Structures are given as structure tokens and as C-alpha cells.
Amino acid sequence: MLLLDGKATAAAIRAELKEEVAAGLAAAGRAPGLAVILVGEDPASQVYVRNKERGCEEAGIRSEAFRLPADTTQETLEVLIDELNGRADIDGILLQLPLPKGLNSQRCLERISPRKDVDGFHPENMGRLALGLPGFRPCTPAGVMTLLERYDLSPSGKKAVVVGRSNIVGKPLALMLGAPGKYANATVTVCHSGTPDLAEECRQADFLFVAAGRPCLVTSDMVKPGAVVVDVGIHRTDEGLVGDCKYDDISCIAAAMTPVPGGVGPMTIAQLLINTVISWKGRTGIAG
């Protein structure tokens, strides 16, 4: 079985971005700038933010973290977003989710300028994705597509099944897989809680993407031998970190599969860095 190593792939991308940034520094006059907003003390969110800061440092991107208390008001948060929208040295704004109770995350996401929405969650960027127009793509599904391309695994002309329909992963991933292109162009089925026979749908997949948010939901009897399996889930259990798929069993029959951890997670951050550099190039007018 081919291990789809997101950790190694992401490291290679960071190295490439570092060279890209270094080459454009003189023309741009400054490094790319990413603002990260963290509200509250959620431990998982703090880990994610530290990982993003570390990734920025390795890629030559200047990151600026804004850590706000859990009792921050909606107005205060929106004022900060407005300030960052107006700063010339900030190319991307990332709002770490989830937000504490009482804060409207959708309102905040819509407040971020679409031109600085490097997470790809603004309705304008989601709409542009649906219409096949240029724009920032949500980082997790875009990272998945980048991983497939790096391993030269093309779903073109194949049956792709996406388990999960969230706005963050499932919906945009289905759109990306069904779009024209060498590393897309698949026939896509989206499964969810209303799917009558999930196992049967999964067994039809040449490419199976699982983003259901349920640990070990997909088992080996639900996977076609020789399929490519991408596990987007990650869960902390008594046995350690697991995904939405039973890795040990499925890896025996799949042609290729992502591990958990070390698969999709690092690619999500890599795609965030890619989006930030793209924004920097566009905003500073440098070529490439």
C-alpha cells in the first residue's frame, strides 16, 4: 500500500514556499503577513494556532497572533477584523474556530475581506468555487487535492465518494473533485446521515474521502480493494489518535491511504501557507 504522507509533503511545500518568498522579497518590499485570531482558551485551538505559527516561520511568512479572552464581545472581535482588513502588511486573516459561545462565527467570517480570506470560508469565495472562478479554496479540501496531485493520483473518470457534507470539508471537496482538470473530473457521490446504505455507496468508490466526524466509522468491508482512501477525521481516544476509518484493516486492502495523524492535518496548514503566499503576490503585484 502507498502511504500518502501528508507530513512529508507539507514539509516539502514549506521549503518550496520559503524559496518562493525569498525570491520575491526584494520586489514585494516585505514578507507575507498572516494574522491569526484566537478567542478563548480551547486547548486544541491553541495547539492548532502554534502549529500554524511554526509553519509560517518555516515558510518565511510573518505571523501575528491576536489572543483574546473568552468573554470578548462580538463588537470587539469585528472591530479587530476591520482593523486587519485595512492593514497593508496583512495578506491573510485566519479566525480560529470554534469560537466561544455567544459569538457569531458566521458573521465574523463574512466580515473578513474575501481578498484576505485565506481560510476560504467567506461566502464569496465559496460561491466562486461553486462557479469555477478563481478564489481562495478552503484549506482542508484544497490540501487533500494537493496531496493527490503530489502523489500523481488522479480521480479523473473515476467514482469518488465523499462521506460528510460540512461547509468546511465535504461540500467544497465534492465541488473540487467534480470540477474539470487532470486531478479532478471525477463522478462524485456525497453521503451523509440520510444515506440509506452507506456501506454500499462506499464500496463503489475508486476514491473514498471520509469526513464524517465519527471515529472508525468506515471499516474494511466498506472499502473496494485497490481504492484510494483519504481519512479527514481525527479523534482523541483512550487508544490514542484515530481517524474516521479503521486504518489497520483498511490499509491491508487499499491501494493508497492517508495515516492519522500525519495525513490530511499537515496538508491543511500547508494549504493555508500556499493561500497566504498567493494573496501576498497578488497584493504586492509581484510576478509568479
Curated annotation (Swiss-Prot):
Keywords, A to Z, come to: Amino-acid biosynthesis, Histidine biosynthesis, Hydrolase, Methionine biosynthesis, Multifunctional enzyme, NADP, One-carbon metabolism, Oxidoreductase, Purine biosynthesis
The entry lists its GO molecular-function terms as:
methenyltetrahydrofolate cyclohydrolase activity; methylenetetrahydrofolate dehydrogenase (NADP+) activity
Identify one Gene Ontology CC term for this UniProt entry: cytosol
- Cite the SUPFAM superfamilies for this sequence: Aminoacid dehydrogenase-like, N-terminal domain, NAD(P)-binding Rossmann-fold domains
The residues that cross the membrane are none
Q: Which family does it belong to?
A: Belongs to the tetrahydrofolate dehydrogenase/cyclohydrolase family.
- The coding gene here is folD
- Classification via NCBIfam families: PRK10792.1, PRK14184.1, PRK14186.1
The UniProt record gives the binding positions of NADP(+) as G164, R165, S166, S193, I234
Keyword match rRNA processing: no
- Source organism of this protein record: Nitratidesulfovibrio vulgaris (strain DSM 19637 / Miyazaki F)
Q: List the catalysed reactions.
A: (6R)-5,10-methylene-5,6,7,8-tetrahydrofolate + NADP(+) = (6R)-5,10-methenyltetrahydrofolate + NADPH; (6R)-5,10-methenyltetrahydrofolate + H2O = (6R)-10-formyltetrahydrofolate + H(+)
Q: What is its EC number?
A: 1.5.1.5, 3.5.4.9
Q: Which InterPro entries match?
A: Aminoacid_DH-like_N_sf (IPR046346), NAD(P)-bd_dom_sf (IPR036291), THF_DH/CycHdrlase (IPR000672), THF_DH/CycHdrlase_cat_dom (IPR020630), THF_DH/CycHdrlase_CS (IPR020867), THF_DH/CycHdrlase_NAD-bd_dom (IPR020631)
This chain belongs to which protein, by name? Bifunctional protein FolD
Share what the entry says about its subunit structure, partners included: Homodimer.
Q: Which GO terms describe its biological process?
A: L-histidine biosynthetic process; methionine biosynthetic process; purine nucleotide biosynthetic process; tetrahydrofolate interconversion
Q: What does this protein do?
A: Catalyzes the oxidation of 5,10-methylenetetrahydrofolate to 5,10-methenyltetrahydrofolate and then the hydrolysis of 5,10-methenyltetrahydrofolate to 10-formyltetrahydrofolate.
Pathway linked to the protein: One-carbon metabolism; tetrahydrofolate interconversion
CDD domains, per this entry? Answer: NAD_bind_m-THF_DH_Cyclohyd
Top-level taxon of origin: Bacteria
